[in-house]
Swiss-Prot record:
The protein, known as: Acylphosphatase
Molecular function via GO: acylphosphatase activity
PANTHER family reported in the protein's UniProt record: ACYLPHOSPHATASE
Species this chain originates from: Shewanella amazonensis (strain ATCC BAA-1098 / SB2B)
InterPro entries hit by this protein: Acylphosphatase, Acylphosphatase-like_dom, Acylphosphatase-like_dom_sf, Acylphosphatase_CS
Ranges for domain Acylphosphatase-like: 3-90
Record field: catalytic activity: an acyl phosphate + H2O = a carboxylate + phosphate + H(+)
Length: 91
């Protein structure tokens, strides 16, 4: 099991990025959440098998059709909480 915090920067708010991230994560079977951040970025907590989490990280560079991604930062996360689904949360 791999668990990461992903920060996606660029034009990623107001372009349905979170909805598309939700759909992609659920397709992959990755759990966690996606949320808008006050600085205009989007944060994703993703947990699942390492290859599937890596696919979600790769997808972040594409994002939603209207998004323009400038940076994707990934940090390993060691928290104990287990997510059973993937959801959109409010910042």
């Amino acid at each position: 099991m791999r668990r990461v915090l992903i920060r996606v920067k660029g034009k990623v708010q107001g372009v349905c990025f979170r909805r598309f991230a939700l759909e992609r994560a659920r397709e992959l079977g990755v759990t966690g959440y996606v949320t808008n951040m006050d600085d205009g970025s989007v944060q994703i907590l993703a947990q699942g098998s390492a290859p599937l989490v890596e696919k979600l990280i790769d997808w972040c560079w594409e994002g939603s059709p209207a998004a323009s991604v400038n940076a994707v930062e990934v940090n390993e996360d060691e928290a104990d909480e287990i997510y059973l689904d993937f959801s959109i949360t409010q910042s």
